[in-house]
Amino acid sequence: MDWWLLSFFIGAILSLYLPIVPEIFILLLFISLAIALFFNKKTRSASGLFLGMTWMLFNGFQYNNSWLVNNLDIDMMSKKVHQIEGKIVSIPSVDKAHYRFNFQLAKLNGQTMVKPFLIRLRWKLNTKESFIIPAQGHTYRLTVKVKPAHGYANEGGFSYQTWLREKHIVATGYVKSATENSLLSSNTGLRQLLYSQYVYNLPEHPLAPLLLALSFAQRNKISVETWQVLQATGTQHLIAISGLHLGLVASGSFIFFLLVARLLPLNQLLPQVIWQPLLGFNLRYLVLMLSLITTLFYAYLADFSIPTTRALTMLTLYWLTRLLGIKLTLKRWFLLTLCTLVLFAPFSLLSAGFWLSVYAVMIIFLTLWRFSFVLNHRLKFWRIVKGLLIIQLSLTLFLLPLTSFFYQQVSTVSLFANLLAVPMMSFIIIPLCLLSLILLLFNETTAHWIMQLTLDILQWLWQYLLFLTDRSHSLLSLSLVQSQIIAIVVLIIAFRCFVSSSFFNLSRVDNNIYLWLKNSRALLTVIFVSSLLTYSNSTSTHESKPALKNNNQPIDWQVNVLDVGQGLAIVIQQGEHAILYDTGGAYPSGFNLTETVILPYLQYHSINELDKVIISHSDNDHAGGLTLLRNNIAIGEVIVNDEAIRKSGDGLCLLGQSFNWQGLNFHQLWPEKKQGRDNDDSCVILISDGTFSVLLTGDISKKIERLLVSKAKDNLLTLNADVLIAAHHGSKTSSSIEFINQVKPSAVVFSAGFLNRWNMPAKLVKQRFIDEKIVIHSTNENGMVRININDRQLNILQYRRDLSPYWFANSKRKFN
């Protein structure tokens, strides 16, 4: 059975590597094959593989067809304003007058949904709506604009689309201010009532949001500064309600109910009608059931988040086997947990938190098994101390590959932080936090006092974490290469520790740590050298000295048109050297494309310094992220024309100027005058290696295109390019047929937002390129577009089709 369970789980994982979700007919074939394999003893395990794969893909099929099953047209949905009815199913996050929440759609324009689905809405309340306080459980009629679930698609960036799918959210949108917005029912869920009461009684304190995270899994109020400390010290896992928290609730409630049952005269306190039936129950079984109910309630308060659900599943299986008298090996218990999660929460496999928690449990089990000889001690206290120490060492080391892969950074002080934080959180802070939650139901004054006490103790721990954060290089940002080095080294160590019998000859070691280290000196040398290489690479900066190129040697370079929505950001790249053309936008809400897209991309590629930053013009969607960029990465030179955003030492982009960078020639073709405010002041640049060329056009209109064509015909400049980055996101005001014919590109790239309100790129413009047999690429459908030039060849890659072609991270739409 263990092999079947393992193959089922592996099949679910393998399904994630497919580029599309097959049609239902193919899935039925998979099921038929699985059944046929199951009835043959030799192939029974393989049946689990196909069933696991089919189950995951079937859930993907259902998600993708949420629109179709309700007879809704995706494209028409995004173009109109709709009136919807439904219920808020999450505690809204609030930022000033901005609310964000998950909404279960029941009706759309009066049409009842065959299968209601979730949408993620934001609602900015106006003065007429200021009396409205959205809450979980409320039913509303709202006027909204929605789009299918979508997110930016770039290397190194956060996949919002995967996150939405993980939460089963099918669409996103916003509420329009309208008189039709009305509250239909004010029935509030118990979770929301307790949350509101808790917030009302919570003392004013910078760390108060951490108590909300520990009690209700609500982390949206945690400040950026607090998150930075948690990340730098590797302690963010302590505020995600998971196995540690549920384990404390389970054990604490079990002990409490057991003491109550044994110490209190229940036969005198309880009515005979209740007490008499209890006599027939085994006391420990009754206590187990009460403990299970208590833990379930805490998981409900945490909204059954993925780490919570994983831990709850493990505990529930343990309780049920105890109650039913079933004996399970540790391995089967773990495999049953994984398969149960795949069955009831299949999209949890898309969550980084799921994999971190699963691997953490595996590491704990393996460590206790492999290092059991180290834990031998006559005194129980020292056995516990040694156990906690070695488990924390193992978790810190063996989770490094996952943390570096998911977050592109590792904490160098996490071991020291967790050695104190874990016991303090486990035995003091979390119990006090939960106690305040319980007392809130009986006495708000006492609950408030416990909250204040918890915050005071938490403040002491916080001072220690701040001390560690202030250490030099407490948090290292890692590139893909550095993450791979870490993964290889840790895998070698894991193999030697948990697999290789030659590493541990327990009879010879006999608790002699010196002998153990002596036998492992080769391995320790590898670890030390690799650590030095990773550290030096992560802290070094790259000088922007131009590389000497042999004229006969082809130059390998890339032009990466990043997916920044309705804006522009292009990275011209050679290895770890890069030039950035435009920065994307920044918005009043604090959302900034430089922080979300550009910096993660540069970090992913080990680019610690930009040789140049070129700003085409000062519109927000092109230059909004410049200030944040200046503050977060070293820049050799900024080329910008608008005086409003220029600084001393910045260069200019003017017709006739050019420069050579890493063997590439950058010819500035426009503007003629130093302005940079309007679209027609955009810095137009032709990049060429002598064989291939790419033309960057900013937001110029047909008027400037005509001037450039005229100059090209007079041999004053060259416009010919292999790839054209279309002007102004493909608007009707640009990309004239005369300009296209003069440039003569073989491919064009549009940088535009997904289903944007301006319908860019315009159909008319796209048709012009199609008529000229020019291949079209667009970031709004394809994600990041990479123009790859190497070995005297040019090829274009799309992120969704070529670089990350996985069904769970992409929409059902077809790629160009």
Model-based region annotation:
Residues 53-237, 591, 596-604, 609, ...:
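Membrane-interface helix/helix-cap signal primarily in integral membrane proteins
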Residues 8-9, 295, 299-300, 304-491, ...:
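Internal transmembrane alpha-helical bundles of multi-pass membrane proteins
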Residues 166-314, 397, 666, 693-698, ...:
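Aromatic-rich juxtamembrane segments at the membrane interface
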Residues 11, 86, 353, 399, ...:
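Residue-level signal for inorganic ion chemistry
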Residues 1-81, 136, 172, 179, ...:
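N-terminal leader/targeting segments
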Residues 1-2, 21, 239-247, 283-287, ...:
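Membrane-interface micro-motifs in multi-pass membrane enzymes
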Residues 99, 109-111, 129-132, 136-143, ...:
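Non-globular, low-confidence helical/coil segments that flank catalytic cores
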Residues 151-153, 259-283, 322-333, 369-381:
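Alpha-helical transmembrane bundle and helix-membrane interface signal
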